[in-house]
């Protein structure tokens, strides 16, 4: 040995570092620093040799560990046992630096270990400290792969996480009647949550109210804009109400819409303006205004008046028909009375409309009372109607009165005999029809109209009257003082006719 080798060995002893070549693992102990003795395991078929190279390249015969056969372990990129070196606490070299030798381009991930795990690492199996040597069983020297290291790390992390979760559960779940502070804390949190929810509800309500106000305001603005547009498009809306009837556009508008617009314009408000159908459809969803109430009232009144007009038309027809009949009766009877040629002076006040009309007609000139053929046909049809009405009225009076009237031959005729009276009336009607068709006015079998005043005057004179043909009439005794119409007929085939009285008020 030269001085250089001695210097190296001395430094190795001082630093407790082995600078030998490949396949040498040094386990250093702070207690003993004696010579090295490595127990070989001949059963595995290895020769243990150790050699040291000097600067001169001389080989020193030292213990070497050389495999007896060549295998995959001799590959230069294979992880060797010297890659893992166990370093004590007193060593100056750290563990990552000791394992930082690179054997390939792909370096496995290194998991940091704790001091407790370092004692269990099966790098070289169990390190045996013998006197003066470090015993390492080579058959138990294996290297941990990266997968095993990762699995052990995950297992430890799982254990740690499970322990932390168990500790959290133990703190959150209170014991029965012991952890009151946790209960109070949970109660306070629940109350705070309820208060927050209530505050959110109030905020939402305020927001909805604000949105509703904005909606109503925008709807009002839209309505005003529509009114302005309608004014610009339809100039007839800007014209006064009096001049609208002359505009051609206003004449095409229905009557109902005119009344509605007139009602709206008469309201004492500056905002009241005529509305078209589109505006009314948009305003239906809004609240009812006083204008709408007045419009509805006007419509109801118009509907009531239309209903009343439906009933008034038939009544007007009946009244008109009644007036026509009354006028024709008075005119015909007055004309018959004027044929006698004895006009009489009007005396006193008339007791009814029939007396006044009859006296006025008697005072007229005889030339104005000429009968035309059309008047004859009208009088014939009218007399047939009057005779039917008279027959019905006489039948009722005959049942009530049961009076007996005598004629010139003093033959008693009872009013209860309705068939006899109807027979005579039909005969007289046919005779009058024949006379009128022939055009002989003097031979008409017409009955004369006599009032109570005339009847009293005749009774005061001769108590008898002569008609146009010179026949003598029947004597009469009036039992009633009321205003009645006396129909006096001509004698038919030397047979006296029956005199019947009908009140004018019955018509």
From Swiss-Prot:
Q: In what ranges is there compositional bias, type Basic and acidic residues?
A: 293-304, 406-424
What name does UniProt use for this protein? Topoisomerase I damage affected protein 11
Compartment(s) of residence: Cytoplasm
User: Which residues, renumbered to this chain, carry the PTM Phosphoserine?
Assistant: 247, 289
Query: Highest taxon of the source?
Result: Eukaryota
List residues, modification Phosphothreonine: 239
Q: Name the species this protein comes from.
A: Saccharomyces cerevisiae (strain YJM789)
Locate the compositionally biased regions of type Polar residues.
260-290, 335-362, 371-380, 494-507
Q: Where is the composition biased (Basic residues)?
A: 473-482
Family affiliation: Belongs to the TDA11 family.
